[in-house]
Amino acid sequence: GNVVSDGSEIVIFTYGQHMISECLKLKNFLREKGLNLKVINMPNVNSFSLNRIKKIIKKINFICILEDHMRDGGMGDLLTSFLAEHNLLNKRKIKNFSIDAFPKCGTHQEVLNYHKIDFKNLAQKILRFKKFK
């Protein structure tokens, strides 16, 4: 993965122009709450470099995965399995944010809003996930 924006407390793996944009809005919003988010663009959603992933998550205990499609069989499933296989989860918390029902139709932003994976809803979920208020 490629570091789009560096951070030190939470890492979020995502891909694609729309989701990167949403993550950068999320990063700015969370910065105001005192959280420092690292944003990673995954050019390949089904193959991962062990050394690269180790470097990305080093010293980070909260891992998020964001994708704008169905959860089952997506990057979140694959990356979570990869992390577990290589014993990289340890005490880290991991959360997958994706679409868990048949996707609604509309503009990209309308779909994100409906499924609550837009930056405002994600911020609330991440704050609860991190138990930081």
Predicted region positions:
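Thiamine diphosphate
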Residues: G1-K133
